Amino acid sequence: MSVIQLVFRLLCVLDLLLAVSASGLHGRNRTLSHEYCVLGAGPAGLQMGYFLSRSQRDYIILERNAGPGSFFNIYPRHRKLISINKIYTGRRNKEFNLRHDWNSLLSDRPDLLFQRISRKLYPSADDFPHYLSLFEKELGLKVKYGTDVGRIKASDFNGHQGYVLTDQNGVNYQCRVLLVSTGLWVPQEVDFRGSDLVEGYESIPTDPEEFKDQAVLILGKGNSAFETAQSILGRASRIHLYSPSPVRLAWQTHYVGDLRAVNNELLDTYQLKSLDGLVEGRLEDIAIVRRAKDRGKRRAAKKRNSTSTKRNEPLYLTLTELLDDQNDTNISNVTGQNLPGYHTDNFSLRQPYDRVIRCLGFRFNFSIFDGSARPPQSSGARGRLPGVTAWYEGRGTPNMFVLGIAAHSRDYRMSAGGFIHGFRYTVRAVHKILEQRYHNIAWPTTNIPISQLQSWILRRVNEASGTYQMFGVLGDIILLQGSHCEYLEEFPLQALPQLSALSGRSISDHGLLVLVMQYGLNHTDTLGPGRAESEWTKAWKSNFLHPVLYYYKTLPTDKDMRQRPVGWPLPRPEAVHHMVEDFLTEWDQPISHSQPLRRFLEHCLKTDLRAFYAESCFLLSLTSRNPPLFCRQGYLRKQGIMGNRHLWQHAREAGLMEDAALSEDASVPEYLNHAGAAVISTVNFDL
């Protein structure tokens, strides 16, 4: 090889190295621009990605881990989901079945349901990331994995406030709209003396043998606390749960975030006096300490696998006010006089513990937001969540929307917004708001003749899954327009004063109706006698989930919303109608459900909404200058079901029509053949 060739090759290598170096430096400072940035590829992020993809918007989903739903790779620690996967409902209606499918995301693919992955009623947590991966790949969503966003700041985006997200490689992502779907993953902690001796739910061993013959104190009384207790129930010598509030049972409160029956076995051993128990007290007032005389000692009956001597030293719960020096950080020099048992000899938690475990849930990660983009902490949920508006936009952070469990502050302890079967619908609602605000595409509506409104409402209360799961939070809005109405599905109720701006739909002088699913306000024994109301004349006393209709002549204002009665989802209306609760959740009976609903609608609309057979419409059209609305909007427009031998035979056998209605040759009268016979139900409303 000549010297010239050698020099030439060296120059080529040097040029290549310089190019790679320049590319790397350039990559650290490059900026990628998108209309929408979705932060987090969990269920809420992928759900929004689906809607953005279907609308053909410019978006990117940024995920710090290597796959979707990474939270479920770790939690729940004992790998059993408590979200219902009820496959068999006796129905084939896909919308109805979503009422009892708490794990699937929404899509136009009927085969893309969670039951494709698992058939268990309470599935394994390992199945959920698998389902999310399937959802992402089969729908072709745009997800960029391995992108750990460490800083978010506000910036100008074409004259409007946008956001810049910076990842671990220094790459900037500039977006017009930021959609935060990071979930809750930062462990909730309480600062008290000795908190460093406490183990966290996120790091405890999951092998029950690790707790063999140990006394365990668990801080918290939520599902994670009871899940942990249940896993060691057959191994630990005693388990005590300690928190400020008494345990709340989901089957009493109707809130799925409260203690579920699938996790409550410890209540048996507590109430049947088998060494386990629940105690209430403020966590901020306690201290976890070691007694000086116990230092270096090991109890023979409490040997543990750990080689740490300190871990084997007994731990005591005491009150900060009993310590000699409340500012002393040394929690190992405590004497018997510093323990509650010295002052109250029957103090519930006077015996020592081998382990203290923190199971206090999780909080939102505020640390990645700088001052220009940081949403405020919520007033509820102990500030664990970001504060958002009624349409899920961050307070003080325009064009930043919060999705999923992080937006649960809007319905905390009230509805299912913190869970997949709830926030899949709020994500869809947010997408409709985005379409109106940024693309001038109004909220989808269905134009319905007033004569068909009752039937449409009955269909929704018997099938709709969004209003059923997000009861009291999402509702159907019916904009009355005279002879017809516009029907908006699943609108955020607390945003009702902003309906026109958020939906792009105007309110007429005829007013509006709002359809809501809600529980009763009376707190009754949910398993006791008289727990349910079956008399339709007392429907307003219903305790369990049931439909409620609100009628307003004008759109409620922000002031009306703030001053609404306690426990009401909406302000006081002009008129209200409760459909009596139903054991089967089927509101389709003529006397208890249909007729009272029709009477209420007639009262609000000042219109006769009775349904008539085609023969009656024919006679009324000949004898009246103003036939009923049902006839004008149906029969006189040649609408309805064409009569045939089968329909007429059914009507005769059901006693709806006289035998004379069928001629000897069973042919349909000529005028009915021409117009069509409307067959609406098994009840003749021609009365």
UniProtKB/Swiss-Prot annotation:
Record bears the keyword Signal: yes
Glycosylation positions in this chain: N29, N305
Organism of derivation: Danio rerio (Zebrafish)
GO biological process: ERAD pathway
InterPro entries cross-referenced by the UniProt entry: Auxin_biosynth/cation_transpt, FAD/NAD-bd_sf
Pfam family, one: Pyr_redox_3
Known role: Probable flavoprotein which may function in endoplasmic reticulum associated degradation (ERAD). May bind non-native proteins in the endoplasmic reticulum and target them to the ubiquitination machinery for subsequent degradation.
Stored Gene3D superfamilies: FAD/NAD(P)-binding domain
Protein name per UniProt: FAD-dependent oxidoreductase domain-containing protein 2
Gene expressing this chain: foxred2
GO molecular function, one term: flavin adenine dinucleotide binding
Cleavable signal peptide: 1-22
Post-translational modification: N-glycosylated.
GO cellular component: endoplasmic reticulum lumen
Main location: endoplasmic reticulum
Subcellular location: Endoplasmic reticulum lumen
Named cofactor requirement(s): FAD
